[in-house]
Amino acid sequence: REAVRSGILHGRDRILLLRGSEGGALLGYVSYRYLSATQLFGALRDTGLADRIRLRSAGTTLLITSAAADSSDPLRDCLQLLMTEVLARALSDDCIYGLYRPYGAPPEPDLEDLLTRQGFLCREGDPSLWEVDMSAPTVLIQNLETTIQEPLCQNHRLLAAIQRGHRRLQTALTQLYPRFLVLTLSAGVIHQRLLEMITAYNEVPAVPTESRKLGRNMCVPYGKMLRGKIVPNTVTKTIHTDRVYSPDLSQSSMEPFPHYPPIQSQIRTIKSFDRPVILVDDLMHPGFRIRALDPILRQEGVDIRIVLVGLLSGHGRDLMDAQGRPVDSVYYLPRLREWFVESTLYPFVGGNTIRRPASPVPGLLPGINHILPYASPSFRGECSEEAVFQLSRVCLESARDVISVLEQEYRALYGRSLTLSRLPEAIILPLCPDKGTCLNYDPTLAASVYLENDLEQLMRTHS
């Protein structure tokens, strides 16, 4: 401890603290600093290492020097939250290389596991030095727990299964682009900070008040983030949209979510409120939704005050500049190679809608998950076949494990089986993996049965 304290003071490190919401108890910390090319030797005290990092980084380097967090609650990963914040801040500050070199002993097993899941690699012969390339990160949005209905979403067995699957998924993603950073963003954290940003822009309290006083602006979520949610002291109205793919996945279009009016009618309803609008989405990178909505918003004369998103990339900022829209975000990443939303990788839990004349099971839309054996992932040409296979396998196995626990807990709670026809009682907006128009699902069977079959089909393709 004294070595850590002395090192932090001598190196003039920055310290990021994590405190509990009740009482402000300290839950963890990370110490770090930024290094320019000329500062590498002074921090590393190794000429060969400093030169190698200098050639690889070609810019600012993030140096993490110590980290520790409370691990008493296995369902609360405090260390992950801290590491995410440090890495995200470093990326927004244009750091393109990351190092972990602790003061004192090599990292504990928990921290070593965490570093591995972020894409850090241990330098050969030096267990106290870990490196990661931050120039083209992959982002994983952790949101699976937000897809489960109440009260099952608070079940400890289910949350533990979700966490196990999440950690396996992180590890699998590091193999797509070895040596490169995998940044995990919590949907819960994004949700809370978006609420704070919306109420701040609307100049109203971030918590409900007894005498309700509405702000001048209205909040309009147009993606999956905040869909169906109410923002404190703010008029909130969702534009219900859905990205729908053709059966061969060659085309996609923005359409109203099933059972909702046409998008233009929804926007006219927004216009009728006669308020400036705060548009809200989870991600602004390819900008598919905003590209489709922008012409209609302009045609109807909707006054857009600002666009708020959870994650904004450099490409997304350029798109907003081109459209002349002000934009702000919870996280800003100048460079983004690939992004994944956790729930869309889990069959029956999420995915993208497929255009079909009828639903395979009443209450379930036909969907596609961009993993094997359902589809060829868009990144397949850039990654090894083994990495793509292992990612698909992890997604199927984790989905099976999570849904199996969900089925058990549903039966214990309600005294009946969780079949496909009852899946909407346990999962918010579930999808059924599309099998074409000739194969039918049995609505009386469980989703885990079909996941076992799909896993067998995947294993047949692997030699």
Describe each model-derived feature in a short phrase:
Residues 4-5, 49-54:
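Short, P/G- and charge-enriched loop/turn segments at secondary-structure junctions
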Residues 2-23, 31, 37:
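Active-site rim helix/loop that mediates acceptor-substrate recognition in acyltransferases
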Residues 74-91, 104:
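ATP/nucleotide-binding catalytic cores
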Residues 35-37, 71-72:
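Short coil/turn motifs at secondary-structure junctions
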Residues 1, 17, 32-36, 45-48, ...:
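PRPP-associated nucleotide enzymes
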Residues 7, 14, 24-25, 91, ...:
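Catalytic cores of nucleotide-enabled group-transfer and carboxylate-activating enzymes in metabolic
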Residues 22-30, 59-62:
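Glycine-rich phosphate/pyrophosphate-binding loop shared by adenosine-nucleotide-utilizing enzymes
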Residues 54-59, 69-81, 284-286:
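Conserved glycine-rich acetyl-CoA-binding loop
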